[in-house]
Design a protein with these regions (language model features):
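Fe-S-dependent hydro-lyases/dehydratases of central metabolism
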Residues: 1-195
Length: 195
């Protein structure tokens, strides 16, 4: 489902889902109870408290033998070490800044933040990283199209077209990637060392 999320949800979206593991590769997604989700579906609106954010950046290089479980465990272990055992992620929004992770890795990382007890997560990227992520997702969809998996409504081709439109918006400056305000305040800031 991640590939579809890469193309159907843009980086400005706010998503409400009925699962604590509701995460998207772009935008910010909140897990909520069924009543809150029902109200959101019925009215298009929802009221919920927005928690503080924790800014997470990465330095170093991910080793070829590492996968995202290693990154998740390293992130959690280093965070606990740096904050004297306090889980600063619990109940907060993790704002993932790409740093040295490539776009696809960073967007995948946000999906794992539920394991860190975060309320939500969002990936902050620059224009080039966001375009790279959209291009990766497009190529995966094109493989499905080439294998004859599109339907008579050309839903898969529509996803490719949507990605092309978003790429055009980014390149033209019409709708830049979501980025925090220059004076954004955080509960904490934390850098993960991948070395």
């Amino acid at each position: 489902h991640k590939v579809l999320n890469d193309l159907t949800v843009d980086d400005w979206a706010i998503i409400i889902g009925g699962d604590s593991h509701t995460r998207m590769s772009k935008g910010v997604a909140f897990g909520a109870d069924s009543g809150t989700v029902a109200i959101a579906l019925a009215t298009g609106e929802v009221t919920m408290p927005i928690p503080d954010s924790v800014k997470v950046t990465f330095k170093g290089e991910m080793m070829p033998y590492m996968d995202f479980r290693d990154v998740v465990h390293a992130t959690q272990a280093q965070m606990l070490d740096n904050f004297n055992g306090e889980n600063i992620f619990q109940g907060r929004i993790i704002e993932v800044h790409i740093g040295t992770l490539i776009a696809d890795e960073a967007f995948t990382f946000t999906d794992w933040t539920a394991e860190m007890k975060a309320k939500a997560s969002i990936c902050i990227s620059d224009s080039d990283a966001l375009i790279d992520s959209l291009e990766i997702a497009k190529e995966r969809i094109k493989v499905m199209i080439d294998k004859g998996m599109d339907n008579s409504l050309f839903v898969l081709q529509g996803l490719v077209n949507k990605a092309d439109k978003r790429i055009s918006e980014i390149k033209s400056g019409l709708k830049k990637p979501l980025f925090p305000d220059s004076d954004a305040k955080y509960y904490a800031e934390f850098e993960v060392n991948l070395d």
